[in-house]
Amino acid sequence: MSLLEDIVDLLKCVLEYFGVPPDMLVPVWESTHCGQYRSLVRMIGTNLPLSPYPRLRFQIPLQTFNKHSHIDVSVDSPAIPTLADVLWLVEDEGDSHTKFRNAVPLRKKCVPHGYETPSLGSVSVKAQRGGGVLAQSTQPDALLKISALEEELQRLRAQIATIITAPAGPVVSPTDPGTPCSAPKPAPVLTSTPVCPPPPPPPPPPAMPTRTEVSMSEMIQQRQAAKKETLAQCGPSLTTAPSMLEVLRDLNQVKLRSVERSPGGTPIRRRRSKGVACSSDPAALIAEALKRKFAHRQRDDSFGKENHSAEPSPFSSPDTPRIFQHTRRSQGRIHL
């Protein structure tokens, strides 16, 4: 306890030296004082003869540029910035000087002296806007290029279909000089006699995509009309359901259809005759030509599989060698 008493006496001496009454040593949580008496640090700080540090004070000017290019201090404007000023600063176009939200735009009105030099920010904003305009103008160009490529693809499909359906021979179909399929012209022969100018090129063939589009639309209309007719014919028959008595009555008279079978007993399947591809559809013509071209390869593969099955497998037992009777007799006579 002597140590605590010594500490209390030391604190009393220190407080008396600084001019603090010793009654202030009561704990803070027991005292009811407010303000400068709330803590020991506040009490020491208020009693010390120290000059307070000057506080920072922000001064917001109320000067704004009026329409008549003179400074008017009496303009009714808020002195404290708000959140609206933050949004206004974000939407700023980049000026070389500071202005307030309620000020008149200096670009439309007269600019005071000293603010005539543009900033780098304004130049960058203009460049960005110019880039956006260029990006918008390039979109229709890209659409035009895509449409041109689609037309060229349809033209190539039509040409491939005409080449496939044409009979084999030296006949060369006239092609469009603008297409990549056109063959290069031979070099002119140098002769001493004057050469007549070459004849004009033949006119290009009519565009195939238009005919294909018309034919496809006609086919779709015909199919829809045929579907409607079949539905109209089958409608009354579907509504009337057959009675079970009629079905059971004819059960004894059922006859099975005769099916042709091979010698092994398996039924013979006949190949279905496929109709001729539509001449107006280039994709169908190309598919039919490819099927004809690769049909012999499928036949060769199936024939090779059948022959391969007859060959001995590596896992089968080896064949026993056959020994004829005359060799046995000859060998027996030699040993005897």
Swiss-Prot record:
Keyword Coiled coil: yes
Start-end of Basic and acidic residues biased regions: 297-309
Basic residues compositional bias, start-end: 325-336
Entry keyword set: Coiled coil, Mitochondrion
GO cellular component term of the entry, any: mitochondrion
Region entry Disordered, spans: 296-336
Source domain of life: Eukaryota
Coiled coil: 139-166
Subcellular localization, as worded in the UniProt entry: Mitochondrion
Main location per the UniProt record: mitochondrion
Gene Ontology BP terms: aerobic respiration; mitochondrial fission
This protein's record includes keyword Coiled coil: yes
UniProt xrefs under InterPro entries: Mtfr1
Family the entry assigns: Belongs to the MTFR1 family.
Function: May play a role in mitochondrial aerobic respiration. Can also promote mitochondrial fission.
Protein name: Mitochondrial fission regulator 2
Species in which this protein is naturally found: Danio rerio
Gene name of this polypeptide: mtfr2
